């Protein structure tokens, strides 16, 4: 005797394939389950993700929220004294332009902060107001 709890869905391999276009009594005859006219009836049609039948989709009906300030933010980069030792010679001038030319900073960078890490062996000339020195670097420069 078969009990309800033992019934199972046939696995995809055993499931009967849908025969299309084989007469009206099959349930999938004539238009082969595609309906009459419209995008879905055409060959090669795939419904786009989020498509809602021509109406304005949900992702366009819902208002956008918030504001990103990223476009307008000033780009600030950090450089260590250790790195400056390897890039500049003694008595050289340090400015945003020289840092950009030597590809130390990105070309869109508008400010640089110099951080104390290791010793600064060379005496450098700080030209640009956009280059900010940390307290540790300021005290190091005064001692040199």
UniProtKB/Swiss-Prot annotation:
Gene Ontology process terms (BP): translation
Matching NCBIfam families: rplO_bact
Family note: Belongs to the universal ribosomal protein uL15 family.
Lineage: Bacteria, Pseudomonadati, Chlamydiota, Chlamydiia, Chlamydiales
Gene responsible for this protein: rplO
Purpose: Binds to the 23S rRNA.
Species this protein is from: Chlamydia muridarum (strain MoPn / Nigg)
Region (Disordered): 1-48
Molecular functions per Gene Ontology: rRNA binding; structural constituent of ribosome
Taxonomic superkingdom: Bacteria
Oligomeric form and interacting partners: Part of the 50S ribosomal subunit.
Keywords, ordered alphabetically: Ribonucleoprotein, Ribosomal protein, RNA-binding, rRNA-binding
A Gene Ontology term for the protein's cellular component: cytosolic large ribosomal subunit
Name of the protein in its database record: Large ribosomal subunit protein uL15
InterPro entries xref list: Ribosomal_uL15, Ribosomal_uL15/eL18_sf, Ribosomal_uL15_bac-type
